[in-house]
Amino acid sequence: MEYDEKLVRFRQAHLNPFNKHLGPRHHEQEPNEKAQEVTSEDTLPELPAGEPEFCYSERMMDLGLSEDHFSRPVGLFLASDVQQLRQAIEECKQVILELPEQSEKQKDAVVRLIHLRLKLQELKDPNEEEPNIRVLLEHRFYKEKSKSVKQTCDKCNTIIWGLIQTWYTCTGCYYRCHSKCLNLISRPCVSSKVSHQAEYELNICPETGLDSQDYRCAECRAPISLRGVPSEARQCDYTGQYYCSHCHWNDLAVIPARVVHNWDFEPRKVSRCSMRYLALMVSRPVLRLREINPLLFNYVEELVEIRKLRQDILLMKPYFITCKEAMEARLLLQLQDRQHFVENDEMYSIQDLLEVHMGRLSCSLTEIHTIFAKHIKLDCERCQAKGFVCELCKEGDVLFPFDSHTSVCNDCSAVFHRDCYYDNSTTCPKCARLTLRKQSLFQEPGLDVDA
């Protein structure tokens, strides 16, 4: 009996850790072993009290098989006391002073300084079990109070039951997660990227291959492959990179590169990070279509119409700025959702192009154009007095630079009938008059000296 106990203890201590089917109390029988077989009905002798039991996970740790070799996400600060945070804040201040002014590195250092100060503020308030504000990887999480709305955790991809679980939402990128998942987050807040680098990837699906990613998810670095592993590789059509199923939920989004190059608005599958970035960027006017794809105006008639309406609105803007009635009526606020329309005629957002494609932007902009023109030409006497009379034919109604049948001199901004201007292709009358006036001003002092 003593021999059996020693044999059991020996096999428990030398269990093969790679055999997943055998527990700590089961063993394989050697082929040349003459000992009696232990059936499933037989019970193994109990170990004496006080003897340490070997378990599978402990043996795995001893062999180094359960180690986490992945580095922690960039920006994750693990300081546990106030003194370490204060020291890190002072070092960050020194780095900011040493970096060049207005450089990208200095901006990133300022963001990190804000993050450290907010983290310090959290540690100074230890009384709250679940703080209302949590700052992590540039996310600014607020505790949600809604108990009835059912959401999905962006980290563990499971349902958030607000009635029994505490959860947070980032105010910048609307990232949602359980309170227990906060410290496991590896994705930085994309709102900081939007504020610092407001630009799109304009190459269509710039794929580099799984080998360039070391066969790991581009975000969380989990092992992925096209086949052979539990986590399938899913490609993001915006970045061209591959992600695991936790970071890529097969969300659909319109790809900016396909819009500006192919006028293609079909939604494609993108990762969660790309989806949130595109959602935050959708209304930002960062696309200069004339430089990216000037031929697009030759094939999309609606873009030509929109460009003409925007040019007219820019010509109307000086009338409104100098008109008291227009300022009181706040006419320019009709375009408050598209402030770039009263600043230039070149920049577009993806939201603008989407509405051009659906035919909505042309209708709404034409309506606003009509309201603006009505104020200048009919409703306001001050604005009417700023009109022009064609100096070539001296006939017809008062002209304005945004009228469709007029032409504007590039030098003096005088307005003429289009037919009159092109039929009399000589010098502009107003330009000639201004030239004579300048010559007379230069000659008068000379005449006084001779006299």
Curated annotation (Swiss-Prot):
Stored Pfam families: C1_1 (PF00130), RH_dom (PF13901)
Positions with biased composition (Basic and acidic residues): 25-36
GO biological process, one term: positive regulation of bone resorption
Entry keyword Zinc-finger: yes
SMART domains from the UniProt entry: C1 (SM00109), DUF4206 (SM01175)
Modified residue annotations for Phosphoserine: 440
Keyword Zinc: yes
GO molecular function: zinc ion binding
Stretches for region Disordered: 18-48
Zinc finger (Phorbol-ester/DAG-type): 138-189, 368-428
UniProt keyword terms in alphabetical order: Metal-binding, Phosphoprotein, Repeat, Zinc, Zinc-finger
Subunit structure comment from the entry: Interacts (via C-terminus) with PLEKHM1; this interaction is weak but increased in a RAB7A-dependent manner.
Reported function: Positively regulates lysosome peripheral distribution and ruffled border formation in osteoclasts. Involved in bone resorption.
Family: Belongs to the DEF8 family.
Protein name (record): Differentially expressed in FDCP 8 homolog
Organism expressing this protein natively: Rattus norvegicus
